[in-house]
């Protein structure tokens, strides 16, 4: 169990999870606001 925790906390695994979630977030934003240069929820 300790080896699995050590493996999951290594940089390539964390980077894969981070970039995967970031890509998913960007895909979902582009699905709801296609071709948006300015996003409505960022305008103040």
Swiss-Prot record:
SUPFAM superfamilies in the record: Subunit IX of photosystem I reaction centre, PsaJ (SSF81544)
Main location as per UniProt: plastid
GO annotation terms (biological process): photosynthesis
Gene3D superfamilies xrefs: Single helix bin
Keywords: Chloroplast, Membrane, Photosynthesis, Photosystem I, Plastid, Thylakoid, Transmembrane, Transmembrane helix
Membrane topology designation: Single-pass membrane protein
Taxonomic superkingdom: Eukaryota
Transmembrane domains' residue ranges: 7-27
InterPro entries on file: PSI_PsaJ, PSI_PsaJ_sf
GO CC annotation: chloroplast thylakoid membrane; photosystem I
Localization annotation: Plastid, Chloroplast thylakoid membrane
Similarity-based family: Belongs to the PsaJ family.
Function: May help in the organization of the PsaE and PsaF subunits.
The protein's name: Photosystem I reaction center subunit IX
Organism: Cycas taitungensis (Prince sago)
GN (gene name): psaJ
